[in-house]
Amino acid sequence: MFKCIPIFKGCNRQVEFVDKRHCSLPQVPEEILRYSRTLEELFLDANHIRDLPKNFFRLHRLRKLGLSDNEIGRLPPDIQNFENLVELDVSRNDIPDIPDDIKHLQSLQVADFSSNPIPKLPSGFSQLKNLTVLGLNDMSLTTLPADFGSLTQLESLELRENLLKHLPETISQLTKLKRLDLGDNEIEDLPPYLGYLPGLHELWLDHNQLQRLPPELGLLTKLTYLDVSENRLEELPNEISGLVSLTDLDLAQNLLEALPDGIAKLSRLTILKLDQNRLQRLNDTLGNCENMQELILTENFLSELPASIGQMTKLNNLNVDRNALEYLPLEIGQCANLGVLSLRDNKLKKLPPELGNCTVLHVLDVSGNQLLYLPYSLVNLQLKAVWLSENQSQPLLTFQPDTDAETGEQVLSCYLLPQQEYQPITPARDLESDSEPFEEREPSRTVVKFSEEATQEKETPFVRQNTPHPKDLKAKAQKLKVERSRNEEHANLVTLPEENGTKLAETPTETRTIANNHQQQPHPVQQPIVGVNSKQPVVVGVVTPTTTTVAPTGVQGGSEGASSTANNVKAATAAVVAELAATVGGSDEVQDDDEQEDEFESDRRVGFQVEGEDDDFYKRPPKLHRRDTPHHLKNKRVQHLTDKQASEILANALASQERNDTTPQHSLSGKVTSPIEEEEQLEVEQEQQQQQQQHPFDSSLSPISAGKTAEASTDPDNLDGVTELRLEQYEIHIERTAAGLGLSIAGGKGSTPFKGDDDGIFISRVTEAGPADLAGLKVGDKVIKVNGIVVVDADHYQAVQVLKACGAVLVLVVQREVTRLIGHPVFSEDGSVSQISVETRPLVADAPPAASISHERYIPAPIEIVPQQQHLQQQQQQPIQQVAPTHSYSGNVFATPTAAQTVQPAVSAAPNGLLLNGREAPLSYIQLHTTLIRDQIGQGLGFSIAGGKGSPPFKDDCDGIFISRITEGGLAYRDGKIMVGDRVMAINGNDMTEAHHDAAVACLTEPQRFVRLVLQREYRGPLEPPTSPRSPAVLNSLSPSGYLANRPANFSRSVVEVEQPYKYNTLATTTPTPKPTVPASISNNNNTLPSSKTNGFATAAAATIDSSTGQPVPAPRRTNSVPMGDGDIGAGSTTSGDSGEAQPSSLRPLTSDDFQAMIPAHFLSGGSQHQVHVARPNEVGVSAVTVNVNKPQPDLPMFPAAPTELGRVTETITKSTFTETVMTRITDNQLAEPLISEEVVLPKNQGSLGFSIIGGTDHSCVPFGTREPGIFISHIVPGGIASKCGKLRMGDRILKVNEADVSKATHQDAVLELLKPGDEIKLTIQHDPLPPGFQEVLLSKAEGERLGMHIKGGLNGQRGNPADPSDEGVFVSKINSVGAARRDGRLKVGMRLLEVNGHSLLGASHQDAVNVLRNAGNEIQLVVCKGYDKSNLIHSIGQAGGMSTGFNSSASCSGGSRQGSRASETGSELSQSQSVSSLDHEEDERLRQDFDVFASQKPDAQQPTGPSVLAAAAAMVHGASSPTPPAATSNITPLPTAAAVASADLTAPDTPATQTVALIHAEQQAHQQQQQTQLAPLGQEKSTQEKVLEIVRAADAFTTVPPKSPSEHHEQDKIQKTTTVVISKHTLDTNPTTPTTPAAPLSIAGAESANSAGAPSPAVPASTPGSAPVLPAVAVQTQTQTTSTEKDEEEESQLQSTPASRDGAEEQQEEVRAKPTPTKVPKSVSDKKRFFESAMEDQHKPTQKTDKVFSFLSKDEVEKLRQEEERKIATLRRDKNSRLLDAANDNIDKDAAQQRTKSNSNSSSGDDNDDSDQEEGIARGDSVDNAALGHFDDAEDMRNPLDEIEAVFRS
């Protein structure tokens, strides 16, 4: 009995999504079957389910079903019950066949049946017309159905791993197919009709038996990927040249012997794989594929490469392993981007010297060849690996320069050259132990030593020698080179780059600071030896063991650090040695990571003597560290080459020191090494430097110069001394769009480096015109941070994951190399370089002058940056603020540096907070606010937390609560704002800064649907807001009254303002400080009165008013904010956003009052905030009140203007009390594709042109050209000239006709231009985008089935678009619950009909549209587009729940609570007002036109307080042109009912149905008002002022305006309507002494007067004479112009001529009921008494609650029956009224004739006869009156069933 108590979890759950993947379920859980009414997505993948129960197929609402990776053995036919299924995945099961009943799943779009033993597809499978993605991999299919081409919507078809041999011919009908996978089948012949798939992008044909390709394959012009590997192809068709879009071509493992010439025309080809074929030569034109990046030619029979290979300038990877190459073409040096060249196992004997021009080559594999030496030009390359032998242990060897004996050329050699065949190592060598000391093993080694007497080297041919030890080889080489250098002249001169060609300092890298903490053992300074070899590039220096310690110098370490170190050394020789030792020199020992604890070990330097051998040199134990040989593709650092900039700085410092030396004994060293040796020596030192700089740049200001990364060069080797290469740092904001970010990355730890030996993350590709390109990102930028996360040391996959989880806005911090012009060389008289003139840029700390301050930009930051050091920032920026412009917006404006602006030195405090005296940037924080919405109570949020009190800390020295894990696909993952490492500051308003872990878990697991999180993210960067390319270029000032200056505190886009941090602390410690003195001239909020403080919060004053709108400024949610005022701020002062006081800000939940204050005033009044001015003149006798009722201002949206930047922007306003109400606007801006224009020539001598036009400057062109009107093609006749042309379509804009511009022409002028005589007509058209929602709908009606929809609109009909009264289109106004339209499901209420079976409805009348649809037959081809949104209209009138933005948010009508449920599905609530013509029966139903969509609620007779008669009359006046707010004036004292009816009849439209409805409404309201008035006590009578105000409210109904189109908010003309209310006092006297009552004039339309307008209001007869109440008679005079018919005037004259000689009280009571004739039936005293007693009893009876009546009728049928009853009753009553009036007129005529006859015959008759005649006439009149009342009672009786139906409908 208690199972349905709501506290139980399983009761009434609205479950829509269930995910039970990987749960080891043996069967479908039973609880899932309980959700049959709500469940839409069910995932049961990866379980052990064998059978599907019968009840499982009752889940009729399922849209997505996942059953993959189970053990299902049968798919029952009951699967046809899933009519709404869109996605089905049953792959990896044991299903033997697919039931034929699957054809009933007409909504299925994605299906996967892969990995099931299914031998064939069912015959009905081809009826799944909506399938777009179909997976049939790994099945046993041998054939496909012959009608497989019927799946015309297919975009992806996978048939891999089947047994297919043939394809059906109908497959060519799959015109939308983009991806076709036929790999791993048994296809021998590819059918030619496969080339007729115009949209194909990817084609997989690998692992088949193909021997040839059809020539028709060249027709696939959009094909980008073609894989035909592992087939038997012997040749390719030359038509392959037609694949102009092809980028990837895989021809591996075939039998090709030659390539067709057409392959050279594939200009977009980037990857070509031809390995394992039989190619003997390549085409000479293959080089025309200029975009080639990867060319694989492994295992062929090639003996040479074509010379055109040099044209492939983008080639990155060339692999020609295992061929028969004998030489390389010289043009190989033109491949500037070649990075990997593999020539293994060929017959090469030499390499061309031009190979040295491939500057980015880093891997060269020439093992297995016959090379004698390597070209000397390889020293210019930054090689990481040179493979010369199979058994090579290190990727890069030490090479020695040598001379070729035959040619005399300078070459490189090593111990593996000349190349020989591979010889295995002897076993004895393998047994040698590496653990024993080197000194002990050295005597047992076989070492080749060179004798020292061989001082002169002879030119000898290359002879293979035993490999010497590297130490001995180095000593010998140094000795030989130094001996040779002694004979050179000018040994101590520094040569120009033209003389020695030094290529040392050209490696672009960032400057690094060297920190050496190890003390070196002092050693005797060796005698320096001078030596320079002009034939070889050298580095001159002295190797001297001295103590050198280079301290870190921040970013500008480099040469400054080296120079400062050199100055500390006394001897100039030692200075040179120190520099060389610290930065460049011959260091053989630098500590690794695992050896850093060895701090006191001496750092020894090795120097070589020239005079004689030093025994101590050989006794010194060398520190050789064993390293594993890295693979050349695994990005293991092979050799750390010298950084180009580091080399520049060191060489410049050395040369500068040499030129500045004046002491004679300072001579140069004789150490001469090759650049490769030097780079090898620097390897380990640079590793140490990189370890010391974990985060070289942590700033995010854009642009940020990384200091002087390359100091001004003073050496001629540095690019002639005129430029420098520096690294600048930028922060770039990219907003993600639906197409992605438009960028690709490369590199990372463990991946092939993108640039040089840098294993960082680089931007490898930027999509043109994509988000990244528009944001300013460039290829080659190195990514430092992604949304605050450092990715310097991340691997590639980690970087990809960070980018995926970045959310909607991506904030990248990148480094970019920039070349700067810095100076020029100055030559002295002797021709030497005496000085380098460098433009010095002093880095001063003073603020720049006002003229150099850069432009200010308003940057909407994507996230809220809350720096801790904001006070420090204000102090640093104080000088700049003093000279800033007066109107600067300091909240989010920063200054970008201009050319005149300078940067401070690194040793001072930088204003941007990058580096302060060499320290890291200050730590800032990002405040994030997000709300996670559960789909159901109890659902997980998709993230885990760690930390908190009582739990192990997540971060050191912090016991806060942090996000530790985010579940992929969960709520947090889909939200996109939360990241791992974020600190949780608050959960649903609960402070979490000092909370326990269990408390946070309890808050997160509470049964609440909305979980509001406040997060804090660390942000190391500048204190200013970052730049954004989305921002406007220049924003000099902001209006103080504008939106940005007064925007609500909790309004947020994806970008929010910069605010100060608020901490979650108690308010008791808050101490107010005195206000700083702020001049009034710089105050921004001039209208704000001083506010007071209460409990630390600033309470907003009541007089806070926006100066521009006069509306209250929203209450602030937080007290402190960035100062928004203009002008400078005093030193040391801190300003608050409200009162200028500095205090810790606190967070409090947004209360209902705060939210109410943020809503604009015009929303509170429902759009009817009128300014009513009441002028009271001096009251003399009669009180007159003049009321000016202004036309209301149109509703303005609460949001600002929609953003115009690219990407998706979500704007929300959230009201949080016990529930949460959210208003959201999503703007998704995308780049518009350029419109295509072309010229079309049509012949005019063959008849009609076959198309129609619409539009012009004087005609509407809706729905085309909504933004720019013009002339458009509205219809194309099938089979006509325009249709046969094939270039024209509906919606094309006509720009010119025979060179005559018609873009601004009127409609008639355009027609005349088209009709001008001539043999042909030349049209210039523009293919404008089709209207939104444009589609073709084919409806098929079954026999006897109804179409089931209604239409509205068209010419000469009522307007069809309630949002735009000027729209003349035809719209779908209603979809019935049964019929073809409902069954099809594509037609929706509000759609615009464009064509029906080829008949255009643009410009058609309503009746024509109805006739076309009724005569369309069973097959109806409709062309529709989007019209208006029905749900938006319901929401706009405040009836759809949520936050109303419509016209009547304060008063509601009956039925308003229902219009969000079923009404939104069928449109039945709107149907009564929108539907004009039903298309299913022939009778004309246009009489059912109602007033307007906004007046769809009818007055309910059962309401205790119904709408007043005046409001109803206002509705009659406006008809269908202005909405009447329902129940807006429900308390107005009623007027005499006859006056109201008269006004309704006078002003209602001419349609009989409208008059009838108006009469019925007036009768209902009059009857109701009569009861209320008669039962009202006298003591409740209202004052005159109250009545006047109620009349004014009623008059508002006359000024309400219909809304414009939702997309347009035009400024409407302000119409002022004047209503004059004349109040006259009358005394009601129960004694009928006066035969007539004086009537105050009632003028409606200022022309006609109505009878009884001045009659007193009905009241209860007074019990005592003399106590009659005094009631005003009110006359309303308006300026509204209406028309009346002659019939109305006749009836009015008849009403006025009726005698009124009865009792006043009786007249008041009977006047309400006797509407057809004004004659009254006298009542006796007993009748009056009984009526009065019954009325008093009814007053005291309790109102009975209407029971809910069950009805089998649907809402549509009840509505139809109701309207038919109303129409019949109105028609019957009108006919009876006419007959009664005719009968009364006939009786009067007969009496007059008889009287004349009697008077003629009996002229002497007395007064008695006359009296009898008069009495007889009165009796006849009374009988007519009685008859009229009787008929009227009959009509009222007929309305009883209508009231019962209405009661059922209301319930």
UniProtKB/Swiss-Prot annotation:
<protein>
    <recommendedName>
        <fullName>Protein lap4</fullName>
    </recommendedName>
</protein>
<feature type="repeat" description="LRR 13">
    <location>
        <begin position="314"/>
        <end position="335"/>
    </location>
</feature>
<dbReference type="GO" id="GO:0005918">
    <property type="term" value="C:septate junction"/>
</dbReference>
<feature type="repeat" description="LRR 14">
    <location>
        <begin position="337"/>
        <end position="358"/>
    </location>
</feature>
<dbReference type="GO" id="GO:0008285">
    <property type="term" value="P:negative regulation of cell population proliferation"/>
</dbReference>
<feature type="coiled-coil region">
    <location>
        <begin position="471"/>
        <end position="492"/>
    </location>
</feature>
<feature type="modified residue" description="Phosphoserine">
    <location>
        <position position="837"/>
    </location>
</feature>
<feature type="region of interest" description="Disordered">
    <location>
        <begin position="584"/>
        <end position="641"/>
    </location>
</feature>
<feature type="repeat" description="LRR 12">
    <location>
        <begin position="291"/>
        <end position="312"/>
    </location>
</feature>
<dbReference type="GO" id="GO:0050680">
    <property type="term" value="P:negative regulation of epithelial cell proliferation"/>
</dbReference>
<feature type="compositionally biased region" description="Acidic residues">
    <location>
        <begin position="589"/>
        <end position="601"/>
    </location>
</feature>
<feature type="repeat" description="LRR 1">
    <location>
        <begin position="38"/>
        <end position="59"/>
    </location>
</feature>
<feature type="modified residue" description="Phosphoserine">
    <location>
        <position position="705"/>
    </location>
</feature>
<dbReference type="GO" id="GO:0001738">
    <property type="term" value="P:morphogenesis of a polarized epithelium"/>
</dbReference>
<dbReference type="GO" id="GO:0045169">
    <property type="term" value="C:fusome"/>
</dbReference>
<dbReference type="GO" id="GO:0030707">
    <property type="term" value="P:follicle cell of egg chamber development"/>
</dbReference>
<feature type="repeat" description="LRR 8">
    <location>
        <begin position="199"/>
        <end position="220"/>
    </location>
</feature>
<dbReference type="GO" id="GO:0045179">
    <property type="term" value="C:apical cortex"/>
</dbReference>
<dbReference type="InterPro" id="IPR003591">
    <property type="entry name" value="Leu-rich_rpt_typical-subtyp"/>
</dbReference>
<feature type="compositionally biased region" description="Basic and acidic residues">
    <location>
        <begin position="1831"/>
        <end position="1851"/>
    </location>
</feature>
<dbReference type="GO" id="GO:0048863">
    <property type="term" value="P:stem cell differentiation"/>
</dbReference>
<keyword id="KW-0716">Sensory transduction</keyword>
<dbReference type="GO" id="GO:0060581">
    <property type="term" value="P:cell fate commitment involved in pattern specification"/>
</dbReference>
<dbReference type="GO" id="GO:0042048">
    <property type="term" value="P:olfactory behavior"/>
</dbReference>
<dbReference type="GO" id="GO:0019991">
    <property type="term" value="P:septate junction assembly"/>
</dbReference>
<feature type="repeat" description="LRR 3">
    <location>
        <begin position="84"/>
        <end position="105"/>
    </location>
</feature>
<feature type="modified residue" description="Phosphoserine">
    <location>
        <position position="834"/>
    </location>
</feature>
<dbReference type="GO" id="GO:0007613">
    <property type="term" value="P:memory"/>
</dbReference>
<dbReference type="GO" id="GO:0007472">
    <property type="term" value="P:wing disc morphogenesis"/>
</dbReference>
<feature type="domain" description="PDZ 1">
    <location>
        <begin position="731"/>
        <end position="818"/>
    </location>
</feature>
<feature type="repeat" description="LRR 11">
    <location>
        <begin position="268"/>
        <end position="289"/>
    </location>
</feature>
<dbReference type="GO" id="GO:0016323">
    <property type="term" value="C:basolateral plasma membrane"/>
</dbReference>
<keyword id="KW-0597">Phosphoprotein</keyword>
<feature type="modified residue" description="Phosphothreonine">
    <location>
        <position position="1599"/>
    </location>
</feature>
<dbReference type="GO" id="GO:0030714">
    <property type="term" value="P:anterior/posterior axis specification, follicular epithelium"/>
</dbReference>
<feature type="repeat" description="LRR 2">
    <location>
        <begin position="61"/>
        <end position="82"/>
    </location>
</feature>
<feature type="repeat" description="LRR 5">
    <location>
        <begin position="130"/>
        <end position="152"/>
    </location>
</feature>
<feature type="compositionally biased region" description="Polar residues">
    <location>
        <begin position="1132"/>
        <end position="1149"/>
    </location>
</feature>
<dbReference type="InterPro" id="IPR001478">
    <property type="entry name" value="PDZ"/>
</dbReference>
<feature type="compositionally biased region" description="Low complexity">
    <location>
        <begin position="1647"/>
        <end position="1669"/>
    </location>
</feature>
<feature type="compositionally biased region" description="Basic and acidic residues">
    <location>
        <begin position="1725"/>
        <end position="1751"/>
    </location>
</feature>
<feature type="repeat" description="LRR 10">
    <location>
        <begin position="245"/>
        <end position="267"/>
    </location>
</feature>
